[in-house]
Amino acid sequence: MKNAAFSMEELFRFLDAGVSAFHSTAAATAILEAEGYVNCPESAAWELAPGGKYYTTRNGSAVLAWRMPKGELTGWHAAASHSDSPTWRIKQFHTEDGVFAKAEVEGYGGMIMPSWFDRPLTVAGRLLVRTGSGIESRLVCPDRALACIPNLCIHFSRDLNNGMKYNPQVDLQPIFGGKGGSLKDVLAEEAGVKAEDILDADLVLATREKAVRMGLNGEYFMSGRIDDLECAYTTLWGFLQGRGEEEGRGDIWVMFDNEEVGSSSRQGAQGTLMADVLARIEESMGVSREQSIRARTNALVLSADNGHATHPNHPEKSDPANPVVMGGGVLLKYNARQTYTTSGFTGAAFTAICKKAGVPVQVFANRADVPGGSTLGNLLGHQILMPMVDIGLGQLAMHSAMETASCADAEYMAKAVAEYYNTPIFQPKDGEWKLGL
């Protein structure tokens, strides 16, 4: 991937692979290992070498990679995204109502519920399996349609097209076929283990459609999980293009879990993953408290999470002064309530970097009468206390089972992030940047 041209096909493979947060993390770690990054389990003692390339995971659903400074620590580059997407969490393996095989589910994140009806679905996640020496995790995702969530026919709900209020406990429960059979047995066979050795599991429903180009000229693409795996992959690609020419700068790329439900878990942005890794790096280098503060001031963190493009059928939902066009470039996200971390100061630095890369920038802001959503940047900021900027890419149908985005924008993000990782960034004094442009 390093020194290779950005490829939409590789992005599509990443989107297709990321059927659960555990699978997204596995896909990312496979890329990192292919690029020579060494796994450092959190439970092990770390021996870190100057200029070394490493990664660690937490809960199997969050991953952080870094390049060690070659000299005395002077600053940081970092990009953060998330591994999870709205879906349905399976509460138990299997029930029967006398006619259908079922599995109880509950909503994970703020999905568009109707988009999940009448699609072939599979099950994805991890099994916790008893072994001779303890417990192991096994990823599973059978490559076949295991379930569907059947719609209520129009004849039984004449008002269905006039605005249906869905009850997830009633309307969104999937069926897994007729009587007989066992979901646990199917997943055990998939994992190559005995069903009785499965002690527990973290499982979700996943769509089976593959990422595909769309449009008369193939300028758009459709996929599940574009939010936020598009940003995860493009920032990872940019991170891997970093040349590491600055002796004292450390580079970080991180993909957190549980953003869609508030980021408050141990593996989420409000957890201590990044803070813990920073502390261990600094300790291994013998960094003083003063050096640590200076290095964290000479930093700029990218919080990368997609935003809403102006909808062609509902332009009135977007800020009229700042329309977002798919294919129009990377989003710079602002919010007066600080749900986005971008300030004029950090926005200026990122804009300058994008100009150098030849990447267009669009301003994303909500209407003044719409509170909008939030993301992981302001939550991560509580842990690491570094200057930050919220960025993303415009897309349609966010939180649908299938979303739509721009091919050109994906390449813009990759180019911008690659330029960012190769641009020296320093604050000679408060309110001023010195950029190696």
State what each model feature region is.
Residues 1-437:
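N-terminal hydrophobic/helix-forming segments and targeting peptides
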